[in-house]
Amino acid sequence: VTNPHPYFAPGGNPDGTRGGGPEHAVPGDQDTARAPLAMAHRGFSLDGLENSMAAFRAAVDLGFRHLETDVHTTADGVLVLFHDKTLDRVTQERGRIADLPAATVARARIGGTEPIPLFEELIAAFPDVRLNIDVKDWNSVDALASAIERHALHDRVLVASFSDRRRRAVLRQLSRPAAGSAGTVSNAVFVLLGPVLPATLMGFVARRALQGVHALQVPVRYGAVTVVTPGFVRRAHRHGLQVHVWTVNKPAEMHRLLDLGVDGIVTDRADLLKTVLTERGTWA
């Protein structure tokens, strides 16, 4: 994909290359095979310790340089890394994070053992790692934007959300652009209208609906609809968009998607994705 945001620049992958295939090479990169982005979904833990420092460390120790994570904000404005809006599913505590002070959230233990990390902890622990951040609630919009500005993370983060409005609200507050991925509505526009609109009209629609978007992050299927098809990948690349697929945990499916030319894979099985990329010669 031509002229990607610095988030996708060399150095983000274990072998220092970027997403996409040779046919999508950036000028000056013709001599370098461009590796897909390998993204560890909530880190890597076979024991259910998702979004814990232990899980992030395990992924980084495997060689991952892109971590996917989620942010919520406590009642007193502290940005934490956690997927659910409540603590109930994976900790011994109960309640909505947005209603609880940081001191209460700090007592929670993921899987009974691991504390919920602060956003600040993750960026300090792994200063060279890039973060795919899913903004889970409106309370986190200002908190995340402030953290990106305070730590100059514009080139290290990709801001994602199922809500296009939340993503845009974060990006609007930044002094320079951070990478972004499409939300549910923008993805639906591209998936549903892409095959039926003439290319020129689709280009106009894409520019309007996908302003500030650098990647389409999608599941292989949504209900009965197959999202990731050869045509979908071609259309995305034609409009300068990367395709990242979540959450892919089977090696055969990883190979199939990589053969289609997707630019990134989000996985719970960082170990298996590393093996697949090693087999394909795109892991250092």
Regions found by a protein language model. Give the residues of each.
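Phosphate-group recognition and catalysis centered on beta-loop-alpha active-site segments
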Residues: 1-284
